[in-house]
From Swiss-Prot:
Family note: Belongs to the class-II pyridoxal-phosphate-dependent aminotransferase family. BioF subfamily.
Superkingdom of the source species: Bacteria
Catalytic activity as recorded in UniProt: 6-carboxyhexanoyl-[ACP] + L-alanine + H(+) = (8S)-8-amino-7-oxononanoate + holo-[ACP] + CO2
PANTHER family reported for this sequence: 8-AMINO-7-OXONONANOATE SYNTHASE, CLASS II AMINOTRANSFERASE/8-AMINO-7-OXONONANOATE SYNTHASE
HAMAP family membership: BioF_aminotrans_2 (MF_01693)
GO molecular function, one term: pyridoxal phosphate binding
EC number: 2.3.1.47
Protein's name according to its UniProt entry: 8-amino-7-oxononanoate synthase
Species the sequence originates in: Vibrio parahaemolyticus serotype O3:K6 (strain RIMD 2210633)
């Protein structure tokens, strides 16, 4: 049998037998509150476009204007000729807004997280991560030369037991956890890190733009400034890409040694141009965050009495079903009633905690959230 074929077929068969096979659906307007699939319209509660910017016409025009000025692609890595005024302006906007000296741009949050850990850590270092951190962080930690330890989710007492008297320590947590929608106790984590002379890195992919009075995210809300902040542009910014924010020396270090940065083509300058507009929109259009608060109250009022309901202060609303088959059954029943929700199953979440990952956006109406509630209750009642 040709190389790798047996392994590939075996893995695919096992995934299918476990009922965990995944597939991609071709949808139209997946970045809007109403999407279309195979000729039918659904209310979309699966998008990470929390502030509703992905299809905002002002942002679309900004990208189009960027295209007219800069063309389509950057043409090179940022260390060659791929770094334009648009990239520089985006970095400046981010640092001024979030209060850091440097911002280093990346093509995705996954690459930013991996670049950070692979570049910063050495064999003598200790990496301490929340056990529910994103796969990009866990993979990079496992593959790095540093010793990785994991603390129980949001458990400060357990975190305190993992420090040693040797080596540099880096504590890494998400600001908002993508599958549970809960926030890290950043003030407590930051204090523990400070007392242990450790650095703190926060991946705020799901908090930036959504939390805080000016949309500064989890750190603004907690009044905490970590040594390193990772923000991504694929959620509240309505686009894609990411940035690592840090002090000047760390920024220079990453610019020189982060291979994901040095050896990747820079993001299109038109994208950077539009992202700079998104930064302004996030700060100035507080009504988008206010809308999320309103929708959260409607969601909670209508569903908090049901088993599986999880209370969160973020737009991420996990509804825990338990078994994978039942989660799929509920998701499919909701779709029959015109509601698009996604069942999240192992290995993304632990076995026995399969769930619907429901997300609210500023483009939803209160009536749409009420319609979701009715459909979900009907689906659960049919189990």
């Amino acid at each position: 049998m040709p190389a790798f074929k047996s392994r590939i077929e075996s893995a695919l068969a096992a995934r299918k037998a476990q009922g965990l096979n995944r597939s991609m659906n071709v949808v139209f307007a997946g970045n809007q509150s109403i999407l279309e699939h195979e000729g039918r319209r659904y209310i979309n509660f699966s998008s990470n476009d929390y502030l509703g910017l992905a299809n905002d016409q002002a942002l679309v025009r900004a990208w189009q204007q960027g295209l007219s000025v800069y063309g389509s692609g950057s043409g090179a890595s940022p260390m060659v000729t791929g770094f334009s005024a648009a990239h520089s302006n985006l970095e400046a906007a981010l640092t001024e807004w979030l209060g850091f000296e440097r911002a280093i741009l990346f093509g995705s949050g996954f690459s930013a997280n991996q670049a950070l850990l692979f570049t910063l850590l050495e064999k003598s270092d200790v990496l301490i991560q929340d056990r529910l951190n994103h796969a990009s962080l866990m993979e990079a930690g496992a593959l790095s030369t540093a010793k990785m330890k994991r603390f129980k989710h949001n458990d400060i007492k357990h975190l305190e037991t993992l420090f040693t008297n040797e080596g540099n320590h880096l504590v890494v947590t998400e600001g908002v956890f993508s599958m549970d929608g809960d926030c890290a106790p950043l003030k407590d984590i930051a204090e523990v890190a400070r007392l242990r002379n450790a650095w703190l890195a926060v991946d705020d992919a799901h908090g930036i733009g959504v939390l805080g009075e000016a949309g500064g995210g989890s750190c603004e809300l907690a009044n905490v400034k970590p040594e390193i902040l990772v923000v991504t542009f694929g959620k509240a910014f309505g686009m894609s890409g990411a940035a690592i924010l840090c002090d000047q020396a760390t920024g220079d270090f990453l610019t020189q040694f982060a291979r994901h940065h040095v050896y990747s083509t820079a993001m299109p300058p038109a994208q950077a141009y539009a992202l700079t507009h998104a930064v302004s929109m996030i700060q100035e259009q507080s009504w988008r965050r206010e809308k999320l608060v309103e929708l959260n109250e409607v969601y909670q009022t209508n569903l908090s009495d049901l088993d599986g309901f999880v209370e969160t202060d973020t737009p991420i609303k996990p509804f825990v079903i338990g078994e994978s088959e039942l989660a799929l059954q509920v998701a499919n029943a909701c779709r029959q009633n015109g509601i698009w929700v996604t069942a999240i199953r192992p290995p993304t979440v632990p076995k026995g905690t399969s769930r619907l990952r429901i997300t609210l956006t500023a483009n939803h109406s209160t009536e749409q959230v009420k319609t979701l509630s009715i459909a979900l209750k009907q689906a659960l009642g049919a189990l």
